[in-house]
């Protein structure tokens, strides 16, 4: 058993929204690893970060992701930082991994004043977001088999594009404006 698609991307890229819609379109369930971590730990991610630190959170996250890659056959949505773990990156080999791309400005706008993202908490959110981008974008690109730009695109268009790629899994760098129906 393996997921139909694994979604990765920065906070605000649409992993939860696209994940729900993609799962519905495929007729499968969605597993959000952040929610699974909270359920397993009995605490919020922010609490885990505050009490145990990021290193312990990443250890738990890798455990949850590895199990989900074996046990879940629907759509799997990973937390934005999951790819920072070499173990997670290794576990993603051979899976269909969809990287939801987003600009810094759009990511900051979409995440707004959210308190559920510990690495973006506090002042200078735009600067923190750009730092996450520089660290994580190369990792997302390394693990992805499908890339889709989510900037200024409605979720339905993103899901349709992903569905077309799942039907034709040839390597991809980014949708063209004609394939996506949106200017890039």
Curated annotation (Swiss-Prot):
Top enzyme class: transferase
Any single GO CC term annotated in Swiss-Prot or TrEMBL for this entry: cytosol
Binding-site list for substrate: 34, 58, 80, 136
InterPro entries registered for this protein in UniProt: P-loop_NTPase, Shikimate/glucono_kinase, Shikimate_kinase/TSH1, Shikimate_kinase_CS
Pathway entry: Metabolic intermediate biosynthesis; chorismate biosynthesis; chorismate from D-erythrose 4-phosphate and phosphoenolpyruvate: step 5/7
Localisation per UniProt entry: Cytoplasm
Region (Disordered): 164-184
Cofactor: Mg(2+)
The family this protein is said to belong to: Belongs to the shikimate kinase family.
Cited function: Catalyzes the specific phosphorylation of the 3-hydroxyl group of shikimic acid using ATP as a cosubstrate.
Name of the protein: Shikimate kinase
Gene this chain is encoded by: aroK
């Amino acid at each position: 058993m393996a997921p139909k698609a694994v979604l990765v991307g920065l906070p605000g890229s649409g992993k939860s929204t696209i994940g729900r819609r993609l799962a519905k379109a495929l007729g499968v369930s969605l597993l959000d690893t952040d929610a699974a971590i909270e359920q397993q730990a009995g605490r919020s991610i922010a609490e885990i970060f505050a009490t145990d630190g990021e290193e312990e959170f990443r250890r738990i996250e890798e455990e949850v992701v590895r199990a989900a890659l074996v046990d879940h056959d629907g759509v799997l949505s990973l937390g934005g930082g999951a790819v920072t773990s070499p173990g997670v990156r290794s576990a993603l080999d051979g899976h269909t991994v969809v990287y939801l791309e987003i600009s810094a400005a759009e990511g900051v706008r979409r995440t707004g004043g959210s308190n559920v993202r510990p690495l973006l908490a506090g002042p200078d959110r735009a600067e923190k977001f750009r730092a996450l981008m520089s660290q994580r974008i190369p990792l997302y690109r390394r693990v992805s088999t499908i890339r889709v730009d989510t900037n200024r695109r409605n979720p339905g268009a993103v899901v349709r594009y992903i569905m077309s790629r799942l039907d034709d899994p040839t390597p991809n760098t980014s949708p063209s404006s004609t394939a996506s129906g949106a200017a890039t």
